[in-house]
Each structure stands twice: as C-alpha cells, then as structure tokens.
C-alpha cells in the first residue's frame, strides 16, 4: 500500500475510548487557533471530537504507517517529513512540539496515554499483512469452506503424523518478526531434493511446528547446521539406522526463550525444545523431500525423528559447555547437531569415586550397536547431576572425564 501523504503542520491521532484523549480535546482546540494547521485522525468513533472535524482512520492505515503505539500522539510535519512527536499528555512536550505556550492550563502537567488500536494484539497480525512492506511469495493454497483445514494438511502430506498449525499469512508474518533477516534470504539448500529454502519458507514450517517468533533464529541456525556436507543430512536420512538430528543448544538465549535443560530434558512438556526440533524435521520433509519410505530408509526409526532438541544446563554444570569446547564463548548462542539414536540410560547408584563411575560409562558405551563390533560409533554423553557431582568433587574437569572414558 502507498504511504499516505503527510499533511504539513500538526497531526494528532486520538481515539474516543481513551480517557487521556478525551481530556486533551480542549488543548487540541487551542492548537487550531495557532499558526500551524492541525489535522486530527480518530481511530474508533468517526464523530470524535465533533468540534474538530476529525478524519476517521477506519482501516488504521494512517496509524500503521505513522507507527503509532500510543494515543494521543502529536506529530509535527514539515515538507511532508516528521520532525518530532510526543505521546500521551505531557504539557512541556506538547508545547515543545507545537511551539505554543500555556496549553491546558487547567489540566495536570502529565497523564499517560493509551494503547493505539494499530498495536492491538487482536488486530496487529491482520494489519501487518495488509500494510506491511513485506510481501509473502509462497504459493497460496485455498481450503474449501467445508473442508477441515487440519485434515486437509494431513491429506496433502504436510505433517509428521501429528497435527500442524495452519500457516496463515498473519501467522507467518508474525513469525518473521522473530528475525532481522529478509524473507527472501536463502538459508540453505535442503537435501535430499536440494531445494533452496528462504527465511519465509522456514517461517512457514516453524508456524506449522508450533514455534513462537523468538524461536525462529534457533530454527534457522539448526537448519544451517544440518544442511551442509559436514553433517550430511542426506546420508542420515538414507541409512537404515534409526538416527536423526540431535540438536544441542547453548548460550543465554536458551534461557531467554525458556528451553528446558533440567528435569525431563528429553521428554515432553517444553514448547521450545519440541517445536524447534520439529520445525527442522518438517523442513527436511516438506521442503527437502525426506519422507519415510522414500529417501528416508530407516528400518525402525526412533521417536526423536519428530524432535530431539534440548539445552545444556550451563548454570548447573560444573564444567565448561559443549559450545565452549568447540571454541565459542559462553555468551554466544549456538547449536551443535549430532546424528543420534534415541537416548539410553546409564545406571550406577553405587559408585562414589570417579574411577568406578568411569568404568560404568565405558562398559555401557561399549554396547553401542554390538559390543563385539570392530567399528567405532560416536555418542553424546548427557550426564545427570548426581554423576557430574562425583567427578566435580574429585576435581575432574570435562576434558579428563572424556579422556578417561
């Protein structure tokens, strides 16, 4: 949509529902007697304020393009360009912006404003689609009115066997607010079909997986990590082994988005853990074509192929983090990906010294696949706090634990 022409002079945006807006009507009337022309836009009631011949911003286009978050807002426009503004009612600020003195002498010097309708949570997604500068380029799929949208997505093969969230334009635009990258930016080439995926397509699948916008950078990072020759997601799919991407997240951002790094860390119940991993798996399936029975040749598979993503307990760990061991700062948000099976439990309730406990870990790790196999297999050891405490009390650091095992 074309940006509305900004009239020179003073522009005031109000709504009747706001008590502060009603309070400052006499002040706006004062402004009309000054040297600058005054244009009043009202968001809700087209007759408010009646004495000022307001323009009804019925579709909120003016409020959206003027980036109005609070009403009343007063803007000063010169040659079509905003030079200053103030929000709410602060007498000194109104006088500074308007260049007039003795405004509202009978009013208190300050009163906060109200939220603009253009940032109303019930309206903002629709307004973002209607007026936002970003135009989504993905193909639209129309669902018949009588068709169940959830069943329609199952029928089209877009799911991992669980219901997915319909990726409406409003939801996708909201998801895109989680990143500063452009929707048209290419994130990766997704195997096995080697299809370019843009930030927009990542956002669509993140919506379907149930992600929040703040999870989107983690989905993008995880996708970049699996879609390269080092990880080789094509090979992970094509093997008959029951493996899939295991995504370990590090950094302060894991706590900011509420990832689980504690009890039940591999289990259900945490939205960030489950949906970040799920979004990546949906992308491999929906964009890359990695579907079971086709390129995905796993004989048994494992439940982690829906999602296997978790955060390291950096605050509770006695050691440096996984990301630090790979050369990154503790303050850096990072993902590490590993082609892994489902978790298995190492039980030792008797060991009280690190040597005995190390023997237990080594004995369990030797059983990977087949204890008599001459092939070596990699593994991630996620140590519980009780076992970690045994090593920490003995003064063993992370490097020694790994070396001894």
Give residue ranges: language-model regions.
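Short, internal strand/loop/helix patches
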Residues: 50-77
